[in-house]
Amino acid sequence: MKKYLELNDLSYDVLGGFIEEAVHQDKRSMPFLLGKAAGYTDMAFVLELITRAEAEELQLCIQIYQGM
C-alpha cells in the first residue's frame, strides 16, 4: 500500500482503491489511513479532479468503514 498519494493519483478509482486497501490494514492504522483518504477526497474535490457525487460517495464509504 502506498503511504501517500501524489496529485496525479487523486482520481475516483485510485481514491477508492486507497480506501479499500486502508480497510485491510491492521486495526491501529486503519483509522489514520481512512482519515488520510478523507483528506485526499476533499483535496480532489476542491481541485475539481472528482465530481461532488463522487466525493460524497467516497466520503460515505469512509464513514461506513470507520463505523466497523
Predicted regions and their residues:
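Acidic, Ser/Pro/Thr-rich low-complexity regulatory regions
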Residues: 1-68
